[in-house]
């Protein structure tokens, strides 16, 4: 039987070409396996398994009780194959490719809003400064109800990107619904929109600077260098680098950031893998002559990958103090391989090691489910604090640091998650209740406080505001006992104040409140 006769599917007596093409790839992969390995016994076993897989796909397609979407089935088979390797090798479909690539880009073309879909409409979380949306006066809380005179009700996130993004210089008309005014339309000319890695940069006091970094993308090192320079001009004598909940990104950006602070020829990182070109050592190239001030790196269990490269290098080279929780423990190097159909495979080719030789990667021997559930284990830090079973490594100056996965901080500060269930539901509610309540307070705050500094010093979430908030919350299907209201009000009140700061003065102001 030839390839063409094997790889067919029936749909109302028509051949589905795309499925036929994908099944053909399975057969061709089988042939390629034989060509690579020859006809030894191992290759014959692999050949038999691939042949079995092809037979199963054909049987499912012809006999399953309901009609199946073969593309979905085949994608699932590919994902299942990569899942068997490790938690971070992954398959990227053609549809996913563009959005995943954007995680590493420094810009896109569009109107410049951070948004969420709430009550069926695009809701502006905040306009990005110096973009068409901010220049047109869009505000946090605005709802986009029509796009080019078509209803935007129940729009999907995918459709938002398709309708609001577009080439620089092209135009889009949006109709805005704003509390207290009639609906109005604005024509926006699309532009290049920066995607910032540095969310906030400011002086905490006269000597300490603070930089919040949320990812490692193509512009991250450059953004941090700019922030450092600006803070130095304000008199900064030490810096706090906040990498909490930063899931990582581009390895080269992490290396460039460490390189700003360490001595020339210090080892920043090394990698080890099975193939020769996956083994490498990365050395510092610059002198820290103008970056010799103290550094504190903040991490938590959400700090992963490139965040662990930075925090691990600062710790091992005795260049900074690491504070917070033990980090995620993702120390696998992925290389992305483009595939002929526009999809891609991201495959682990090596492991990261810190300068002292610590492997960053946590064990995943017990499976992916345990691998991720370990992160929310409340006893994770308690067990880590004993450090009894963990290997010991030495820093550049001879201090003990601990291996075993992730970066263990020099000073452990527990993340305060001791909320009541009602408070946790409030903070994570799908309808973003904190955002909505802050949006209702926004106009009064703008009228009362002319500057953020006055707001920060004088706006208090007092007992009167507490009563008003819980009265507002009564019809939102969230119940709070009286004791819960008292015990958790400082957290809830702080989040409301921070959201107000973000809506009116931007993200740096929000982090000053938090």
Question: Predicted regions span which residues?
Answer:
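Conserved functional hotspot residues or short segments at active or partner-binding sites
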Residues: 359-360, 364-514
